[in-house]
Amino acid sequence: MKEITFDAFYQLYQNDQLSLVDVREVDEFEALHLEGAQNLPLSQLADTYGQLDKDQLHYVICKSGMRSARACQFLAEQGYEVINLQGGMTAFEEL
């Protein structure tokens, strides 16, 4: 599975339009999220992943990087190109 540090991702995020998939639950997402992120909770991902463009690279984030790693594994098995964000939103809050 491909991974990127949050710092490296954040530099890209500030300069480019990226597809960011946030797999935290809705209440977590509503409390704090990165602008432009799409919320597809891991608990519902098996039913909602079809909303994602298969021809696009997707960065996947959660709180710490654990749920996003599971989401990346699932999405990769479905044929999506995904990169896990190490450290997740916890790393963002520490910026």
Task: State the predicted function of each range.
Residues 61:
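Short, surface-exposed ligand- or partner-binding patches at beta-edge/loop junctions that are enriched
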Residues 1-19, 26-57, 66-95:
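Rhodanese-like catalytic fold shared by cysteine-dependent sulfurtransferases
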